[in-house]
Amino acid sequence: MTKPTSTADKSLLGQTTPYCQAYDPTILFPIPRQEKRDELGFDLKTLPFTGEDVWTGYEISWLNLKGKPQVGWAEFVFSAEAPNLIESKSFKLYLNSFNGTRFESEDAVIACWQNDLSQACGKPVGVRFYRLDESIVLQGNLPGHCLDALDIEVEDYQVNPDLLHTDSDQIVSETLNSHLLKSNCLVTGQPDWGSIVVRYEGAQINHEALLKYLISFREHNEFHEQCVERVFTDIMRFCQPKKLTVYARYLRRGGLDINPYRSNYEQVFDRARLVRQ
């Protein structure tokens, strides 16, 4: 039997697992962020950014004390400074464990989420729950100029930061985006589709080079959060902007979508869902 090479290899990903019919916080599977940050050359004490991972849960339900199902959707906000991320399949199974469990109130459910997720990731987690009758329209578009119409020839489908370069020393402030981001799950290899924003101030980044670089994630195996941190780190290293924000909005899988944000100067991020979400 092959020995697992990382914490992720020991998770429930890729395994046949039964759905738990009763609330069970032990399902949650934390994965140390540092395992991948070692590759990028920083740790919690030397983070080159601040940020958060905003998970949207669409399959939210539990029973009230009379056994009547309650439904809604929720946002879960994890700090990039948390030592652990939560493996997505375990998160899905954890949320599903509420489906057959009776709770006294909505507040009791939210308190469980906050307590369990905070313990698992190692830092307080923010939770916003929305009833379906109070939900607002959140669909929007990515800010900035979309690179996807550029007529480029692509040859690299494994991450290649050497593609990145600037055009000149002229300092610009611009926001660029692309819907062509695709990476694969670190463990199962299943495709993760997303859209990404790069906002920066510094020497102008060559647009064709940036698009080729983003497309080069197409056969790369890494979790959503890790991909965004890699994009941030590579751009800082190869283009050296003074200010940089990178965030991605990924399509949902298993009733959850993951939206990582990283920046060295911004604290507030747009959370509008995209049409594919």
Swiss-Prot record:
GO terms for molecular function: preQ1 synthase activity. Gene3D superfamilies: 3.30.1130.10. It is found in: Cytoplasm. It comes from the Bacteria. InterPro entries: GTP-CH-I_C/QueF, NADPH_dep_7-cyano-7-deazaG_red, QueF, QueF_N, QueF_type2. Its EC number is 1.7.1.13. GO terms for cellular component: cytoplasm. Pathway: tRNA modification; tRNA-queuosine biosynthesis. Keywords: Cytoplasm, NADP, Oxidoreductase, Queuosine biosynthesis. One of its GO terms (biological process) is queuosine biosynthetic process. NADPH binds at S88, K89, R253, G254. Substrate binds at I86, E87, S88, H224, E225. It catalyses: 7-aminomethyl-7-carbaguanine + 2 NADP(+) = 7-cyano-7-deazaguanine + 2 NADPH + 3 H(+). The active site is at C185, D192. Belongs to the GTP cyclohydrolase I family. QueF type 2 subfamily. Catalyzes the NADPH-dependent reduction of 7-cyano-7-deazaguanine (preQ0) to 7-aminomethyl-7-deazaguanine (preQ1). PANTHER family: NADPH-DEPENDENT 7-CYANO-7-DEAZAGUANINE REDUCTASE. Homodimer. This is NADPH-dependent 7-cyano-7-deazaguanine reductase. The lineage of its organism: Bacteria, Pseudomonadati, Pseudomonadota, Gammaproteobacteria, Thiotrichales. The gene is queF.
